[in-house]
């Protein structure tokens, strides 16, 4: 269930001085495996300096384009991002998991209504996939709000401008530059004043869904702004592009727990310390449990508690209903009972 496929890097495109777009060559036999919904992400794995490093990156290509690409922005002390932006070459291979994620563009009743996309920094990556797909495959309007420090640090700037020229009536772009004003676009970070102005400007649009992706605080603030406007929470989709601090500390738990793990059609039972996350307990024993970011952001490690109880150090991915139904982020979950049974699902 946690299968990795070796894909060749077909093309590397430099987006800014610190970011690249990686386009993979997908063999015909794997086309179906790597078909994706706009907004999904890929988990990449590479051996760097003798260690296997795994990271999640959102797909930035549109469903309509027939390509599979992700964008990577170098971050301070980022092992994988430094490798991808400075060492990776065309023709190299990377191990890649099939697309996954719940931050996607839906083709249902709300999929026929206009959408508003909020992003900041590298949070624009899934928005590019959603915007390109919506513009090419539907007739809805897309309001695209993108915050960054300056025009020079804006990922996909030329492509965004080209889409704006291609769809002048349906693609409305608004930048918010915090450090360098540009044209008649907003100055400063995305805030309630900007959000209110956009709703006034596009009051005649037939709104369906709202998407927000970027730093934790911005995404939380945007969600609250939208809820205060009376927008149903089921029409607001969010994804975080940075890990937030833990909300609770369970690393001081005492004693051991008997863990029964259902994974890939097999059942394993073993004992572990309660002060280790359920995911780390499984990985330390060589079980191929699914994971990617290890920070409670990507949701690759979701499992369901079938018996016993667990508490999460933080959760900004699962809904209240999912938690009530027994789902956990295993990289953040600690057993609080002496026995626990969990199942990793596809």
Give the ranges of each region predicted by the language model.
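Iron-sulfur (Fe-S) cluster-binding segments and ferredoxin-like electron-carrier domains
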Residues: 284-285, 300-346
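Short histidine
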Residues: 146, 176, 264-268, 273, ...
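Ferredoxin-reductase
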Residues: 2-93, 97, 110-113, 148-150, ...
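FNR/FR-type flavoprotein reductase catalytic core
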Residues: 83-260
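C-terminal accessory/binding modules appended to enzymatic or scaffolding proteins
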Residues: 255-290, 294
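Iron-sulfur (Fe-S) cluster-binding modules
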Residues: 1-3, 8, 51, 228, ...
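Short active-site oxyanion
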Residues: 32, 207-210, 268
